[in-house]
Amino acid sequence: MASCGPSNALQNLSKHASADRSLQHDRMAPGGAPGAQRQQFRSQTQGGQLNNEFQQFAQAGPAHNSFEQSQMGPHFGQQHFGQPHQPQMGQHAPMAHGQQSDWAQSFSQLNLGPQTGPQHTQQSNWGQDFMRQSPQSHQVQPQMANGVMGSMSGMSSFGPMYSNSQLMNSTYGLQTEHQQTHKTETKSSQDAAFEAAFGAVEESITKTSDKGKEVEKDPMEQTYRYDQADALNRQAEHISDNISREEVDIKTDENGEFASIARQIASSLEEADKSKFEKSTFMNLMRRIGNHEVTLDGDKLVNKEGEDIREEVRDELLREGASQENGFQSEAQQTAPLPVHHEAPPPEQIHPHTETGDKQLEDPMVYIEQEAARRAAESGRTVEEEKLNFYSPFEYAQKLGPQGVAKQSNWEEDYDF
């Protein structure tokens, strides 16, 4: 699928590899051209050295002088794997100076992984260790780069990468340890603060409860409280008694005023007509109220036994009124004059114009003429003028009736025959 595209990395690489550069190589002389020495170094010296080293590695023969441990051991062993006094970084025993050994065997014996030895990390001086190790960690990378590049040219491609990876692992380990330690200390401080606050709350609650128990256990305090309660109860009873006495006094005053009014009424009636009201029920009631034999209780009349006498007084008043009415009627009958009987006149005297005794009504027009003439003679006006001002009995009834005054008009217009 990659070859289907217009241009990719594989096609560019194949084009670059298949390009014919034979003419360019022929123009370069092995030893006379200006670039011959450089080409000879690139094609023969470096290539031959790499081939020899590879053959020695395959045959497990002695290493080349450029891979001597004396040249790369101090830099590679001490700078790359850390100083001996650093506990967090891996340590490797340095090789003795001048010792000739197989570089392949030495390389196979290298411990590229992290050391699993015991690490004694103290939380108290982790900041000092980190500050002491930080400058050394920053110096590892340039020293390793210079040492490896100067001592072994063939391993220049992976030497810096290995050094950088080791430095990154060491730095990451220190940072992780620092973060974990910081988190642990923060959590510990938070837990300690929470426990202290919780303990203070518990202590305050305990003190409050203990104080309440002490107050409850104190007999003097309980006695004082009981005395206060008794004093309040006595005060409440005293207030209620005062209120009751005031109510009784008010009732007594009302009954006294009522009795005085009753005595005044009785005395005034006795002075007016003693013989008439002396034995009346009303006068008897007023005397009893004035002598406090009957008192007023709300809307009731109560005797000394506490019985309501309103019904009794009402019945006595009704009987007395009925007897008085009967006495008045009998007295009136005794003093009334006897009726006088008259003989009725004969019918012809009552109705002289009729034989049957029925008197006929006069003609209204004749009555009006006669009445107008009489008024005209008295007032000095003409008869016609009097006719205009004449009111019939019906008109007088309308004027003086309960419906109001009727309008004045000529009777001929209203009663047109």
Swiss-Prot record:
A motif (WxxxF/Y motif 1) lies at residues 103-107. Signal peptide: none annotated. A motif (WxxxF/Y motif 2) lies at residues 126-130, 411-415. Changing W411G: Mislocalization of the non-PTS1/non-PTS2 acyl-CoA oxidases (Aox) izozymes. Does not afect import of PTS1-containing proteins. Residues 17-28, 340-361 have a biased composition (Basic and acidic residues). Coreceptor required for the peroxisomal import of proteins containing a C-terminal PTS2-type peroxisomal targeting signal, such as 3-oxoacyl-CoA thiolase. Acts via its interaction with PEX7, promoting association between PEX7 bound to cargo proteins and the PEX13-PEX14 docking complex. PEX20 along with PEX7 and PTS2-containing cargo proteins are tranlocated into peroxisomes by passing through the PEX13-PEX14 docking complex. Its main location: cytoplasm. There is a cross-link at K15 (Glycyl lysine isopeptide (Lys-Gly) (interchain with G-Cter in ubiquitin)). GO terms for molecular function: peroxisome matrix targeting signal-1 binding; peroxisome matrix targeting signal-2 binding; protein carrier chaperone. Residues 71-92 have a biased composition (Low complexity). Monoubiquitinated at Cys-4 by PEX2 during PEX20 passage through the PEX2-PEX10-PEX12 retrotranslocation channel: monoubiquitination acts as a signal for PEX20 extraction and is required for proper export from peroxisomes and recycling. When PEX5 recycling is compromised, polyubiquitinated at Lys-15 by PEX10 during its passage through the retrotranslocation channel, leading to its degradation. It comes from Yarrowia lipolytica (strain CLIB 122 / E 150) (Yeast). It is found in: Cytoplasm, Cytosol; Peroxisome matrix. Interacts (via WxxxF/Y and LVxEF motifs) with PEX14; promoting translocation through the PEX13-PEX14 docking complex. Interacts with PEX7. Residues 1-47, 65-101, 321-361 are annotated as: Disordered. GO terms for cellular component: cytosol; peroxisomal matrix; peroxisomal membrane. GO terms for biological process: protein import into peroxisome matrix; protein import into peroxisome matrix, docking. There is a cross-link at C4 (Glycyl cysteine thioester (Cys-Gly) (interchain with G-Cter in ubiquitin)). Keywords: Cytoplasm, Isopeptide bond, Peroxisome, Protein transport, Repeat, Thioester bond, Translocation, Transport, Ubl conjugation. It comes from the Eukaryota. This is Peroxisome biogenesis protein 20. The WxxxF/Y motifs mediate interaction with PEX14, promoting association with the PEX13-PEX14 docking complex. Belongs to the peroxisomal targeting signal receptor family. Residues 1-15, 37-47, 323-336 have a biased composition (Polar residues).
